[in-house]
Swiss-Prot record:
Recorded GO CC terms: cytosolic large ribosomal subunit
HAMAP family according to UniProt: Ribosomal_uL22_B (MF_01331_B)
Top-level taxon in the UniProt lineage: Bacteria
Keywords: Ribonucleoprotein, Ribosomal protein, RNA-binding, rRNA-binding
UniProt-recorded name of the protein: Large ribosomal subunit protein uL22
InterPro entries: Ribosomal_uL22, Ribosomal_uL22_bac/chlpt-type, Ribosomal_uL22_bac/org-type, Ribosomal_uL22_CS, Ribosomal_uL22_sf
Species classification: Bacteria, Fusobacteriati, Fusobacteriota, Fusobacteriia, Fusobacteriales
NCBIfam families assigned: rplV_bact
Species this protein is from: Fusobacterium nucleatum subsp. nucleatum (strain ATCC 25586 / DSM 15643 / BCRC 10681 / CIP 101130 / JCM 8532 / KCTC 2640 / LMG 13131 / VPI 4355)
Length: 111
């Protein structure tokens, strides 16, 4: 059985968030929470919150044992890009791209 949680439209770069996601893929859920707690990245906070939600979904909705949960899948997909304008010299303007990401975490009680 698999329980999942999705966080959408998070204001961070999907490329940088995937580096953090790779740290916890395949680990036990409680070990993954410990790793994310001490990872000094912005994405680690968001992924930890999503993982906690997936664990809560598993225990409350599917009556799974929290100690046996494993991070089965974790995906960081690209969301829409917010485009902003920054005025530059001589009447020019540059476009600033602010990326967003969708984070999906699934936990299961099977190995």
């Amino acid at each position: 059985m698999e329980a999942k949680a999705i966080t959408r439209f998070v204001r961070l770069s999907p490329r940088k968030a995937r580096l953090v996601a790779d740290l916890v893929r395949g680990k036990s859920a409680l070990e993954a929470l410990d790793i994310l707690e001490f990872t000094n990245k912005k994405a680690a906070r968001v992924i930890k919150k999503t993982l906690s939600s997936a664990i809560a979904n598993a225990t409350n909705n599917f009556k799974m044992d929290e100690d046996k949960l494993v991070v089965s899948t974790i995906m960081v997909n690209q969301g829409p890009v917010l485009k902003r304008v920054m005025p530059r010299a001589m009447g020019r303007a540059d476009i600033i791209r602010k990326p967003t990401a969708h984070i999906t975490v699934a936990v299961s009680d099977e190995q």
